[in-house]
Regions:
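Short sequence/structural segments immediately N-terminal
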Residues: 5, 21-467
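Bacterial N-terminal signal peptides
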Residues: 9-22
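N-terminal secretory signal peptides that target proteins for export/translocation
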Residues: 1-7
Length: 467
């Protein structure tokens, strides 16, 4: 009898242990995240569920991207960003047709809601108001307005509308338009240019840097995000960065950076060893706050024909003082460098801008103006005379490379791609100009200048109808 009781007790005890163990295993399993799982049962309106289920089948790439985003983790759905009012100018009429489909469970009128295909900074501002305000006042958001004021390709119609749509406007942004049937004009869409003029009146595109539908802070912090537009012979910032010591450190140690640190906390020496574009121009550092206004922290407009202080840049004058902004940039630099190092770097950079202005640009501009005044060059159209091209590339290509290279400490770009080429271009330009003056002869004009058919009317959405 005693042996039976002992055996029974052991069986009961073992069973209890198994039950407890199984419960612990179940609890542990419940606490383990499942790979790429997204649970739509979490308090979502039926319209949002319809979006997710439909796009999961129709566009699995979009769904997968979103499902792995912070938006999804925070229960921010397609509907939250794309929802619109029926009277909004950017409502997608095409999307209404999806609610007339019989092959989809959610393709019925029960789930019909107005949505906008284009998500704009105005939409993003519902959750990111500060970022939207900062971005709206930046050069990025206003770049379409800037280029229409200074760019001869647009002002004089020297390239075609197709060349603009597939080239210039992809980065600078286009003016979104609709066709007669209410769909987006294919000459203006798709477009994620930083200065895009949206149908709801807002400026820009957040997806220029935070691409849809992941909207990753990691992606925006990496220099490659900036390099999609800031590259090439006229603004090679990505190439310049990669040549610099900062780029060297990024190449060697970038895979060790904590790219997903919370905004405002991304810190030198903690999350990264060397800065990227975002660190210097946008991220918080020391007492300097994070900003989506890339106009800040600049003491020169060195992409302009003549280097000027940002507050004196006529197409888009900064509302802040360059000395204040230089102080912010120095504060960023001092997270990794001593005061003498930082101060001496900017002394040289200031001198580079002054030297470019006085030695190269001003004398060349004076000769160009003299040639126009004497009637030896025709200013009605730019680029159709060789000396106009020479002058343009002196500042727009070589001059920029010299200034940008000095700003980011890339000596090969400052000298061989910059000032060395400036010298060659300057000599070629001035010799050509002096020859015209000496012989009092007009320059040869390219009669068959190709594709000079672009619309020269400045967009009313930017400048108004009275200008």
């Amino acid at each position: 009898m005693r042996r039976y009781l002992i055996t029974s007790a052991l069986v009961v005890g073992l069973a209890s242990l198994l039950v407890i163990a199984s419960m612990m295993t179940l609890a542990d399993a419940q606490n383990q995240p499942k790979a790429k799982e997204f649970r739509i049962e979490r308090s979502m309106p039926k319209e949002a569920v319809a979006c997710i289920e439909c796009h999961k089948m129709e566009h699995p790439g979009i769904f997968g991207d979103w499902a792995n985003s912070r938006h999804a983790s925070a229960n921010v759905t397609c509907y939250d960003c794309h929802k619109a009012e029926s009277f909004d100018p950017d409502v997608s009429k095409e999307h209404y047709k999806q609610y007339e489909r019989r092959d989809l469970k959610y393709g019925t009128k029960e789930y019909k809601v107005p949505v906008a295909a284009v998500v704009t900074p105005k939409d993003c501002s519902r959750c990111h108001p500060d970022e939207a305000k900062q971005y709206a006042r930046s050069k990025h958001a206003n770049t379409h307005k800037i280029i229409w004021q200074i760019d001869p390709w647009l002002k004089l119609g020297m390239n075609s509308d197709l060349e603009r749509a597939t080239g210039c406007f992809h980065c600078h942004g286009t003016v979104l338009k609709k066709t007669k049937d209410g769909s987006l004009d294919p000459m203006t869409w798709p477009n994620v240019g930083v200065g895009r003029i949206n149908l709801d009146g807002s400026l820009g595109s957040c997806t220029s840097c935070h691409t849809r539908h992941r909207f990753s802070v990691m992606e925006a912090r990496k220099p490659e995000a900036c390099g999609q537009c800031h590259l090439g012979p006229d603004h090679p910032q990505i190439e310049i960065f990669m040549e610099s010591k900062h780029g060297d450190i990024y190449t060697a140690f970038g895979d060790e950076y904590n790219w997903n640190a919370a905004p405002g906390t991304w810190s030198a020496g903690v999350d990264f060893r060397g800065p990227t574009c975002a660190v210097c121009h946008m991220s918080g550092a020391g007492t300097v706050l994070t900003s989506h206004d890339v106009t800040e922290r600049l003491a020169w407009e060195s992409q302009a024909p003549l280097s000027v202080r940002p507050e004196n840049f006529k197409p888009f004058p900064a509302k802040v003082n360059h000395e204040t902004e230089r102080g912010k940039m120095k504060e960023v630099c001092k997270q990794c460098h001593g005061k003498v190092w930082v101060d001496d770097h900017f002394v040289k950079y200031d001198k580079v801008n002054e030297a470019y202005n006085d030695i190269y640009f001003k004398p060349a501009k004076k000769m160009l103006d003299d040639l126009y005044a004497k009637g030896l060059l025709d200013k009605s159209k730019f680029f159709d005379e060789e000396l106009e091209v020479e002058f343009y590339e002196l500042w727009h290509h070589e001059g920029r490379r010299a200034r940008f290279g000095a700003a980011m400490m890339a000596p090969d770009y400052t000298w061989w791609h910059g000032f060395y080429e400036c010298k060659k271009r300057f000599v070629s330009f001035t010799e050509g100009g002096n020859d015209l003056i000496k012989h009092n002869k007009k320059a040869y004009k390219a009669i068959d200048f190709p594709a000079a058919t672009g619309n020269t009317t400045r967009p009313a959405q930017v400048f108004g109808t009275g200008k």
